[in-house]
């Protein structure tokens, strides 16, 4: 049985809000959110780490490219644990790369580098870690998407309401680049 905590972000969270306190979370029992066709589970966020990093998983179906975006202050890690994920990156000099990551593969995206990804197999899963001086962005997922109590993928993709696209990303160091073109394929 999981313990629930009230935090400033959620009325019921599986993560204790007190920084500096050890805790344990069973598989899948973090703070869950649906965004697009994905299930995001946050295990540690800014509240626990004094805004030094976050730790989350993203599980999704084979599908569309997550839109190109950039973080001005946040470095991001992609570590694939299940399936396959294609990671697209563009460095600050404009050089583009893409790589198919399979279980055990790792990708690092420094701040200010445009990136996107696509799940290449059903039920692919990525462990994400993000860190930066301005705080962490784990609450982005539930604010652009929606918190959920479900353990699985959404039955229908959760497409954000249009008004959220203008306010939510900027609060969490996410800038979408809708006109960005990937020249790698």
Language model segments and positions:
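Glycine- and acidic-residue-biased ligand/ion/polar-headgroup-sensing regions
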Residues: 73-86, 90
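Short histidine-centered beta-strand/loop micro-motifs
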Residues: 44-46, 67-72, 89, 97-99, ...
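Histidine-centered metal-chelating micro-motifs
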Residues: 65-67, 86, 97, 105-116
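Hydrophobic small-molecule pocket/channel-lining residues, especially in calycin-type beta-barrels
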Residues: 64, 85-86, 91-95, 175
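Ligand-binding loop in jelly-roll beta-barrel domains
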Residues: 103, 111-138
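A short, N-terminal "cap"/entry segment at the start of jelly-roll beta-barrel domains
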Residues: 1-53, 155, 159-185
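Short acidic-glycine-tyrosine-enriched beta hairpin
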Residues: 48, 52, 91-111
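A hydrophobic, small-residue-rich beta->alpha segment in the mid-to-C-terminal subdomain
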Residues: 138-155
